[in-house]
């Protein structure tokens, strides 16, 4: 399991996948693993979606895995895809 986790982390780093997270603590946790291409949801959702769509054509969305986090993930993923951004779920599915 730990080896798989490290493999996924290395993949995110080498592919330089943009990751969208809910807050600063999430960002800091990913930073501690060497992941730096991160955006936090610190502005209105539509603004984040537009910013991501301008910056990349593929990103990962790592929201909390509770009920609210799953609802946020669904909304964010849907909006991003409507703006032409492919959602990379490899790491989220691993978790």
Regions found by a protein language model. Give the residues of each.
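TOPRIM fold recognition
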Residues: 24-33, 38, 43-95
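Short glycine-rich phosphate-binding loop at a beta-alpha junction
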Residues: 18-19, 60
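Phosphate-handling DNA/RNA-contact segment within nucleic-acid enzymes
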Residues: 1-18, 24-28, 32, 50-51
């Amino acid at each position: 399991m730990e080896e798989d986790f490290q493999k996924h982390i290395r993949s995110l780093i080498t592919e330089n996948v943009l990751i969208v997270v809910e807050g600063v603590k999430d960002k800091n946790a990913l930073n501690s693993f060497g992941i730096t291409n991160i955006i936090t949801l610190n502005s209105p959702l539509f603004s984040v979606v537009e910013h991501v769509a301008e910056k990349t054509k593929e990103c990962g969305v790592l929201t909390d895995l509770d009920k609210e986090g799953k609802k946020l993930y669904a909304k964010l993923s849907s909006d991003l895809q409507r703006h032409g951004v492919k959602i990379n779920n490899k790491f989220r599915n691993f978790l």
